[in-house]
Curated annotation (Swiss-Prot):
It comes from Xenopus laevis (African clawed frog). Gene3D superfamilies: 3.30.1460.20. Component of the Arp2/3 complex composed of actr2/arp2, actr3/arp3, arpc1 (arpc1a or arpc1b), arpc2, arpc3, arpc4 and arpc5. This is Actin-related protein 2/3 complex subunit 4. GO terms for cellular component: Arp2/3 protein complex; cell projection; cytoplasm; nucleus; site of double-strand break. Keywords: Actin-binding, Cell projection, Cytoplasm, Cytoskeleton, Nucleus.
């Protein structure tokens, strides 16, 4: 793991642990409704200040909290065109299977690659520290996966180019 990744992930972990102090909060507008306030944005007093944790200009995390929900949006490192394409395809693959990941949003926040929505119901049903561990582990693994896919694509392209050039 690189020297800058560990402090970045530690900052995200600490911020998520602080933001996951959620409680049940019924809607102030409709009786017997309970919607994530971070999504609905019905009243300003229920929203916390959004926090952006940035490793560099392209790799950052936006944590938006409210009284009953937290939205975590992640921008993954995309150094070149191959990484952009791989990241887009991988995120699309993940979001198509959002129903299998209870906290994954189908559509990311504008300017980010993937978003998670954690509500008070998730923190009641699952351990908070396990939710935080999942997000951190996801951030570690996504970087590794995209790097491995890039190496695989480059190796495959090299083999194809060699085979093509054998004919000349």
């Amino acid at each position: 793991m690189t020297a800058t990744l560990r402090p970045y992930l530690n900052a995200v972990r600490a911020t998520l642990q602080a933001a996951l102090c959620l409680e049940n909060f019924s809607s102030q507008v409709v009786e017997r409704h309970n919607k994530p306030e971070v999504e609905v944005r019905s009243s300003k007093e229920l929203l916390l200040q959004p926090v952006v944790i940035s490793r560099n200009e392209k790799e950052k995390v936006l944590i938006e909290g409210s009284i009953n929900s937290v939205r975590v949006s992640i921008a993954v490192k995309q150094a070149d065109e191959i990484e952009k394409i791989l990241c887009h395809k991988f995120m699309r693959f993940m979001m198509m299977r959002a129903e299998n990941f209870f906290i994954l949003r189908r559509k990311p926040v504008e300017g980010y690659d993937i978003s998670f929505l954690i509500t008070n119901f998730h923190t009641e049903q699952m351990y908070k520290h396990k939710l935080v561990d999942f997000v951190i582990h996801f951030m570690e693994e996504i970087d590794k996966e995209i790097s491995e896919m890039k190496l695989s694509v480059n190796a495959r392209a090299r083999i194809v180019a060699e085979e093509f050039l054998k004919n000349f």
